[in-house]
C-alpha cells in the first residue's frame, strides 16, 4: 500500500511536469518574425525593431563598460555571459532550454519580449480568424498605457537606470498595423 501511494505521487508529479512543459511556448527569434513583419502592410515592425536599442541590447554587453559594470556588481563572468545581465539584454534571458533552433541571443531584446514566446501562435496570428486564437496561445498585444512589460528591465535594479518615460519610449518602438483597405 505504501508503494502504491509513492508511485501515485511520482505519477502525479510526472504528469504535472509533462503538462506544464507542453503548455510552455518557446522563443523563435526575431528573424522568424521578420520574415513577414518587414512588409509595409504589416507595419514594418521588424525594420523599426532593427533600428532600435533593443536590437543592439546583447551587443552592448560585449563592451568594456558593460564588463566594468558587471565587475562592480560583483559578477565573476563577463557581462555577455552573466545571467544577471542576460535577463534584460536577451529575450528569454538567454535560457537555451526555452528556444527553437532559429533563436539567437545575439538578436538582443526581440519582438517576443513584448509579444510573448511565439511558438504557440506564430502560424496562426496573421490568419483572418487568428487574432483571438493567437491570444489564447500566448500572443500579447501591449499598448502605450501598459508599462509593466517594459519595467521588468527599465527599473531601479538596472545599473544604468535612466528615468523611464513611457510615452517617449513607446514612440521609439511603436509599430501600428496600417488600416485595412
Name each model-derived stretch:
Residues 19-106, 119-144, 164-181:
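Sequence context of c-type cytochrome heme-c attachment sites
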Residues 9-18:
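Bacterial N-terminal signal peptides
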Residues 1-6:
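Positively charged n-region of N-terminal signal peptides that target proteins for export
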Residues 118-119, 158:
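Short Gly/Pro-enriched loop/turn and capping motifs at secondary-structure junctions
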Residues 33, 85-88, 111-114, 150-153:
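Short cysteine-rich clusters marking metal-coordination/redox-active sites
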Residues 143-158:
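A contiguous, mid-protein "functional segment" used to position or interact
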Amino acid at each position: 500500500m505504501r508503494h502504491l501511494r509513492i508511485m501515485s505521487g511520482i505519477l502525479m508529479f510526472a504528469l504535472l511536469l509533462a503538462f506544464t512543459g507542453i503548455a510552455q511556448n518557446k522563443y523563435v527569434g526575431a528573424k522568424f518574425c521578420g520574415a513577414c513583419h518587414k512588409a509595409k502592410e504589416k507595419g514594418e515592425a521588424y525594420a523599426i525593431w532593427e533600428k532600435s536599442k533593443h536590437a543592439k541590447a546583447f551587443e552592448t554587453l560585449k563592451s568594456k563598460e558593460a564588463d566594468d559594470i558587471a565587475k562592480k556588481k560583483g559578477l565573476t563572468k563577463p557581462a555577455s555571459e552573466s545571467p544577471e545581465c542576460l535577463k534584460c539584454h536577451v529575450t528569454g534571458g538567454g535560457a537555451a532550454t526555452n528556444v527553437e533552433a532559429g533563436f539567437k541571443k545575439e538578436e538582443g531584446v526581440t519582438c517576443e519580449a513584448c509579444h510573448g514566446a511565439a511558438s504557440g501562435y506564430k502560424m496562426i496570428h496573421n490568419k483572418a480568424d487568428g487574432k483571438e486564437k493567437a491570444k489564447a496561445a500566448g500572443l500579447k498585444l501591449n499598448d502605450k498605457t501598459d508599462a509593466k512589460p517594459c519595467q521588468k528591465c527599465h527599473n531601479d535594479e538596472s545599473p544604468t537606470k535612466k528615468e523611464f518615460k513611457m510615452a517617449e519610449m513607446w514612440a521609439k518602438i511603436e509599430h501600428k498595423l496600417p488600416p485595412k483597405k
